[in-house]
Swiss-Prot record:
GO terms for molecular function: ATP binding; MAP kinase kinase activity; protein serine kinase activity; protein serine/threonine kinase activity; protein tyrosine kinase activity. Transmembrane segments: none annotated. The lineage of its organism: Eukaryota, Metazoa, Chordata, Craniata, Vertebrata. This is Dual specificity mitogen-activated protein kinase kinase 1. Keywords: ATP-binding, Cytoplasm, Cytoskeleton, Kinase, Membrane, Nucleotide-binding, Nucleus, Phosphoprotein, Serine/threonine-protein kinase, Transferase, Tyrosine-protein kinase. GO terms for biological process: regulation of early endosome to late endosome transport; regulation of Golgi inheritance; regulation of stress-activated MAPK cascade. Ras proteins such as HRAS mediate the activation of RAF proteins such as RAF1 or BRAF which in turn activate extracellular signal-regulated kinases (ERK) through MAPK (mitogen-activated protein kinases) and ERK kinases MAP2K1/MEK1 and MAP2K2/MEK2. Activation occurs through phosphorylation of Ser-218 and Ser-222. MAP2K1/MEK1 binds KSR1 or KSR2 releasing the inhibitory intramolecular interaction between KSR1 or KSR2 protein kinase and N-terminal domains. This allows KSR1 or KSR2 dimerization with BRAF leading to BRAF activation and phosphorylation of MAP2K1. It comes from Cricetulus griseus. The modification Phosphothreonine is found at residues 286, 292. ATP binds at residues 74-82, 97.
Length: 393
């Protein structure tokens, strides 16, 4: 018997998608939320932080353009621009993503309705959601501000991310994907370093997952990029599932461990430059094609080969052996974990349950790692910081 869809735990959305405070039901809502949090088997600190976030969210009320003051730009991608903003009525610092779409009002309203499911996504591994609204031709999605930014930004400063840190990242991504699948029957569809956010409290959270089919369709033509994290089955247009997210996670881990997007694989000379020593393993072999491969442009990494055209890159992902970690610089457990994520046949690829009990994850879970300390020293953040008023909890 299929699982019953979770009942919405949002504040009453208005037809235009803004969240409105129903003061009469606020206490009841909070009690219902607390019951849902109990089902998640969270650590005490995680539960306290989530409860604090949800309590302050109750005070936000209706979101509207006039109530925001821009602080700085956090980043821009295919989807739109993200700003760090101050919500003046509540005093909260938020991240506001602005998506400009030339669409009819009916489509716009459908997107806003579909995005309301984000109110139900409450997990330590998912970026908190304040609400969505429309103004001046743009859809605004208001989220928790993560002061460490995204892992692609962290990678640019770090050069490479250590295996122990990536162990903690892997746990968070697996738990985030598991939560989305088990509690909401949704897959992420866009796992990559820029969609994994971190903060000075040491939290690691997923953002920008595909909850709105209409938004995905409306933005289908906006892709501009030099790299792809899509699985071979998705690129070929065949049926895909959460197994596709696992491929994307595996490819992201190789990129963050090695220090550059790993397709095509680095040759022996580049590996020596990257790691400062001779590195063993298949990753150092020349790719099987007779041509000299290029590579996507990147602001980090030491590959001087000409950039690969996007169609050439996609062809490589589908037809050539998958990326892997070079031997000799990473543990066998980490190498095996990545290999199981990057099996080209999705039926043979490890699933979320198998990955959660993998030796690499078990070891990473047991390791004492000061993720917050590493992050703050790497990107020059003060620790602890206060991404929201809840930081002191």
């Amino acid at each position: 018997m299929p699982k019953k869809k979770p009942t919405p735990i949002q504040l009453n959305p208005t037809p235009d998608g803004s969240a409105v405070n129903g003061t009469s039901s606020a206490e009841t809502n909070l009690e219902a939320l607390q019951k849902k949090l109990e089902e998640l088997e969270l650590e005490e600190q995680q539960r306290n932080r989530l409860e604090a976030f949800l309590t302050q969210k109750q005070k936000v009320g209706e979101l509207k353009d006039d109530d925001f003051e821009k602080i700085s730009e956090l980043g821009a991608g295919n989807g739109g621009v993200v700003f760090k903003v101050s919500h003046k009525p509540s005093g909260l610092v938020m991240a506001r993503k602005l998506i400009h779409l030339e669409i009819k009002p009916a489509i716009r309203n459908q997107i806003i309705r579909e995005l309301q499911v984000l109110h139900e996504c409450n997990s330590p591994y998912i970026v908190g959601f304040y609400g969505v609204f429309y103004s001046d031709g743009e859809i605004s999605i208001c989220m928790e501000h993560m002061d460490g930014g995204s892992l692609d930004q962290v990678l640019k400063k770090a050069g490479r991310i250590p295996e122990q840190i990536l162990g903690k990242v892997s746990i968070a991504v697996i738990k985030g994907l598991t939560y989305l699948r088990e509690k909401h029957k949704i897959m992420h569809r866009d796992v990559k370093p820029s969609n994994i956010l971190v903060n000075s409290r040491g939290e690691i959270k997923l953002c920008d997952f595909g909850v709105s089919g209409q938004l995905i369709d409306s933005m289908a033509n906006s892709f501009v990029g030099t790299r792809s994290y899509m699985s071979p089955e998705r690129l070929q247009g065949t049926h895909y599932s959460v197994q596709s997210d696992i491929w994307s996670m595996g490819l992201s881990l190789v990129e963050m461990a090695v220090g550059r997007y790993p397709i095509p694989p680095p040759d022996a000379k580049e590996l020596e430059l990257l790691f400062g020593c001779q590195v063993e393993g298949d990753a150092a072999e020349t790719p099987p094609r007779p041509r000299t491969p290029g590579r996507p442009l990147s602001s980090y990494g030491m590959d001087s080969r000409p950039p690969m055209a996007i169609f050439e890159l996609l062809d490589y992902i589908v037809n050539e052996p998958p990326a892997k970690l070079p031997s000799g610089v990473f543990s066998l457990e980490f190498q095996d974990f990545v290999n199981k994520c990057l099996i080209k046949n999705p039926a043979e690829r490890a699933d979320l349950k198998q990955l959660l009990v993998h030796a690499f994850i078990k070891r990473s879970d047991a390791e004492e790692v000061d993720f917050a300390g590493w992050l703050c020293s790497t990107i020059g953040l003060n620790q602890p910081s206060t991404p929201t008023h809840a930081a002191s909890i």
